[in-house]
């Protein structure tokens, strides 16, 4: 069995929208043989409603309540990769759950890359405004300290090939003292 499949425990991806959490998460799960979850997709599956609609009807606070339940539930599982919503770290409860149940990986990218990756996505309720660049900058300034607070690994996804990035990430995970490795 290749060493990369010997990585035990949960991997939680945090970062701003467009940083690559879902894309990298899927590839990391494939590479390590783990089950992949996306907290936004899990909320949609449980409610039968799009995240943008939940934001519109219930507001951000109620969405964050749903998100906290999903994170708490999924963190109890073993050997998963979870791509969290960009704002999940705003709640101390979520930060504690993530930090105590697995390895937290902060994916960061330049504002230019984030904007390029999200500008045509109508399912980003926080960016449906006149100046999405200013909003991304504001979100970065607000959330970056929280991402850093719980991150075991920080990796830059700016202009990165997903397969190369996942390879680098697996190397860092193998070298990281922050996660358990299975023993034979």
UniProtKB/Swiss-Prot annotation:
The reaction(s) catalysed by this protein are: shikimate + ATP = 3-phosphoshikimate + ADP + H(+)
Keyword terms of this UniProt record: Amino-acid biosynthesis, Aromatic amino acid biosynthesis, ATP-binding, Cytoplasm, Kinase, Magnesium, Metal-binding, Nucleotide-binding, Transferase
* Residues that, per the record, bind ATP: 18-23, 124, 160
Localisation: Cytoplasm
Q: How is the cofactor bound?
A: Binds 1 Mg(2+) ion per subunit.
EC id? 2.7.1.71
Tree of life domain? Bacteria
Amino acids binding Mg(2+): 22
Q: Name one GO cellular component term.
A: cytosol
Cofactors, names only = Mg(2+)
- InterPro entries registered for this protein in UniProt: P-loop_NTPase, Shikimate/glucono_kinase, Shikimate_kinase/TSH1, Shikimate_kinase_CS
Q: Where along the chain is substrate bound?
A: 40, 64, 86, 143
Q: Which Gene3D superfamilies match?
A: P-loop containing nucleotide triphosphate hydrolases
- Which pathway is recorded for this entry? Metabolic intermediate biosynthesis; chorismate biosynthesis; chorismate from D-erythrose 4-phosphate and phosphoenolpyruvate: step 5/7
Question: Subunit structure, per the record?
Answer: Monomer.
Q: Which PANTHER family match?
A: SHIKIMATE KINASE, SHIKIMATE KINASE 1, CHLOROPLASTIC
Query: Tell me, what does this protein do in biology?
Result: Catalyzes the specific phosphorylation of the 3-hydroxyl group of shikimic acid using ATP as a cosubstrate.
Q: Which family does it belong to?
A: Belongs to the shikimate kinase family.
Q: What is this protein called?
A: Shikimate kinase
Origin organism is Chromobacterium violaceum (strain ATCC 12472 / DSM 30191 / JCM 1249 / CCUG 213 / NBRC 12614 / NCIMB 9131 / NCTC 9757 / MK)
